[in-house]
Amino acid sequence: MGLLLMILASAVLGSFLTLLAQFFLLYRRQPEPPADEAARAGEGFRYIKPVPGLLLREYLYGGGRDEEPSGAAPEGGATPTAAPETPAPPTRETCYFLNATILFLFRELRDTALTRRWVTKKIKVEFEELLQTKTAGRLLEGLSLRDVFLGETVPFIKTIRLVRPVVPSATGEPDGPEGEALPAACPEELAFEAEVEYNGGFHLAIDVDLVFGKSAYLFVKLSRVVGRLRLVFTRVPFTHWFFSFVEDPLIDFEVRSQFEGRPMPQLTSIIVNQLKKIIKRKHTLPNYKIRFKPFFPYQTLQGFEEDEEHIHIQQWALTEGRLKVTLLECSRLLIFGSYDREANVHCTLELSSSVWEEKQRSSIKTVELIKGNLQSVGLTLRLVQSTDGYAGHVIIETVAPNSPAAIADLQRGDRLIAIGGVKITSTLQVLKLIKQAGDRVLVYYERPVGQSNQGAVLQDNFGQLEENFLSSSCQSGYEEEAAGLTVDTESRELDSEFEDLASDVRAQNEFKDEAQSLSHSPKRVPTTLSIKPLGAISPVLNRKLAVGSHPLPPKIQSKDGNKPPPLKTSEITDPAQVSKPTQGSAFKPPVPPRPQAKVPLPSADAPNQAEPDVLVEKPEKVVPPPLVDKSAEKQAKNVDAIDDAAAPKQFLAKQEVAKDVTSETSCPTKDSSDDRQTWESSEILYRNKLGKWTRTRASCLFDIEACHRYLNIALWCRDPFKLGGLICLGHVSLKLEDVALGCLATSNTEYLSKLRLEAPSPKAIVTRTALRNLSMQKGFNDKFCYGDITIHFKYLKEGESDHHVVTNVEKEKEPHLVEEVSVLPKEEQFVGQMGLTENKHSFQDTQFQNPTWCDYCKKKVWTKAASQCMFCAYVCHKKCQEKCLAETSVCGATDRRIDRTLKNLRLEGQETLLGLPPRVDAEASKSVNKTTGLTRHIINTSSRLLNLRQVSKTRLSEPGTDLVEPSPKHTPNTSDNEGSDTEVCGPNSPSKRGNSTGIKLVRKEGGLDDSVFIAVKEIGRDLYRGLPTEERIQKLEFMLDKLQNEIDQELEHNNSLVREEKETTDTRKKSLLSAALAKSGERLQALTLLMIHYRAGIEDIETLESLSLDQHSKKISKYTDDTEEDLDNEISQLIDSQPFSSISDDLFGPSESV
């Protein structure tokens, strides 16, 4: 009995201990993820590049140090730093293992149908090219392949050697302290030279059709080939490989030909010689064929089918979910025609329903033209004939400032579609329809994407700008440009297309030289951060705050005293466009492409009462409402659709439209019609052909819905020639289904991909300098030349949190906010004190020597005697002086003094005022006074060689230093020694290309005096003056084109000399290079003077045409003076090219005036 009890007690105790052990082992401790996933959760995804081992590193980089220059001597021992006991490989290696491997593959593949088709295809291509040659084409009419035999063996590689030096890829890591350690990166290019011999007996039989209707038979056998072959694998500028003979190989052909059963040696010699020429022309260095397969088959153009089936799991699309995208690195970017430039780049991501290329490049707009009782609306039209035989279309050639057309925001280059519902086919029809219309007429027009013209907007809002702005961030002489930037940021209309910024830049130069870029960075726009909610500063931050359940900042209450400016176009009333938040943050470039991004419309919002004189982005600007949660956004979709459909019907008066729009801005709406989501990364430094993002600032989280189909990725850099402009470096569109399938391939739902960037539109010129030699090779495709970007994708599981991204965004944003908010109040208070005491013009009588216009009424000063402000060079008639002081009393010189004082108060290393980047000051100073001079390339690369320099930021910020004031003898509007504001040349005129930047130049010590430039320009005004205007323009533009080419070539030569001078260590060679550089600089300086010389002729034509226009406007000005007094300070003067009463039925010339 006791034994049974003991057994029972033991069983019970054992069961209890087992359960207790199970509890402690299985339930007490939380399940741990695998080691690699735990590391990723703590540190984020880490991208590791493949690296060579120590022995391979020694083979690639170590042996070349002791190798003789001729390459014949064997390499020395290994370096002490890496495997000293292992001897370096010999210079030449035997490849018996490779020969055996190739022979085995040849035996298995020789008789397959796939190999036979590939060989016959290649032979037929050679036949086609042979028939196109002059010699063979005269005798041969056709070649057909009768038989082909690949031979008994393959080429035998006797020896092979690595061509040194081997250049390693950039890693972004600093070099070793002494530079002795071998690089740990893979090589950028591998080149091998092999001695090859072939005796395999490859032969083919050909049937030849001669020109006489006869046929012949040709048998060609490749008996022997001996030569040195170079095999190259390279990543520059894109990944490819090629092989080619180093020198002419020794080739023996065995040829037999028959014609009617008789030998024909003439045909035999032609074929043999042609085959040898083909090998020399195509397969002997420096000629070769760029190849991708079989090693790099991914280097092919990707395409998207129009009708694609979508994958669904039950009722859910495969792509729906939360996708985390992490940027890792970008490489091989083509920046301004070079692969070696350093630049700050950033990336934008967008979820969309369409691909980048599928977006339309123009938009249809509707505007209400208020003609009133005026005879002219200020338009000059041109009929463009269609190339397909149909009727042509009418485009706007010029728009007169302050005219009804300018107020309605019609711009040069707009294509008129219909007026009052009647389709437009001729310029005469436009004249009649507008003449017969009443006070108001509806105009339907098409505007190319990227076109911008802020002139009319500037004039329309000039009064309000003078009353509400105290531009403390402007430099001397830069008041109009800075105001243009601010107003353009408010008044521009970004179409629904996925815009290409490179296209924006070129389109603006094509239509108007001074048009600001559509994608001005908020860094370059004056902004008061202290009065904006976080949602208005960054949509990304706002989204993260909403996700994290943070309270949204309250909306700023508005003041009743401010009135919104009048609105013109009906499409602005779209609430989806009204409530679109400003893209990007106040510290980073915007998020182009910007889908459905419309103008943030003015409202009655204003800054605090305590800051009456503070510089704001625009006092009337609406504060964009913060983004709401997903459910609220979906509820707003139906409202957006209804308002979008009703938008074309809303043609109201200015006050009514403004009132409606202001009321609509309070409605929370979706930021785009197709539920697009955009994100932008932080800027990174791209150098040594590589740019890396930090893990803490390169991740974003997208909520993918069923309407999203593509992830559009674009890389951008700043445009050095346009303030606030951005240039697209490349883009790529990914199917979200491919991304989802790639993530689902592994259980951790993530994968890594390196994506080749597509060319921006319009493409950068890749054949000019960096790729001039490569573009001449067969197989070259410039679409491969724009670099690549490496991205990590991860689909988050349901319920899986990713606090890493939110934390990163907050870390990225908040320090800037704290810094700016803490800095601004002191400076704003100081600005207000200075602005109250110094804001009046100080006019004095001035006699002008050149054609001058009144800055107030915009009329010409015919007597050349007027009043000019002593501080800001503002010019006005003596009769306009009292009106000017009463209405526009703000003097621009006050802004310059304030800005100069604030610069001195600013701490060293601190961000410049109002979010402007440090180099904006230097860029802003470029537009102080427009001067003719350097072309784009000279400005960018060789200003030091010309003994000219841009006004630097340090010079601007020196105490007591002021910019060069305009001479009292000249007005800012005159064309003397300045770039003309009116362009009469074609859109691609060299005069525009060479003078679009308006750089302010200052003479260096020892450089040319300013009088030299003035003298050269004055002499150039008389060039070809005796010729007709059109012929004169053609001759001048021809010379400018020629000079541009010469400058480009000289710049390329100069850059090569600079690189050689940096690389060489020989003192004698360095002195020779210095002398060559000096001569190159002198040549560049001479070419620059010639460019100024011929550009002056273009300006002379512009001046003459403007004078003739003013003389005509003077004749009719007396009829319009009474009308001008009734326009509420929005139209100062109407410049008419031709009154309607003088237009006859035969006005079908090149241009018509309306």
Swiss-Prot record:
Residues 70-85 have a biased composition (Low complexity). The modification Phosphoserine is found at residues 496, 521, 538, 967, 980. Residues 66-90, 548-612, 955-999, 1132-1154 are annotated as: Disordered. Its main location: endoplasmic reticulum. A zinc finger (Phorbol-ester/DAG-type) spans 840-891. The chain crosses the membrane at residues 2-24. Residues 366-449 form the PDZ domain. Keywords: Autism spectrum disorder, Coiled coil, Disease variant, Endoplasmic reticulum, Host-virus interaction, Intellectual disability, Lipid transport, Lipid-binding, Membrane, Metal-binding, Phosphoprotein, Transmembrane, Transmembrane helix, Transport, Zinc, Zinc-finger. It is found in: Endoplasmic reticulum membrane. This is PDZ domain-containing protein 8. It comes from Homo sapiens (Human).
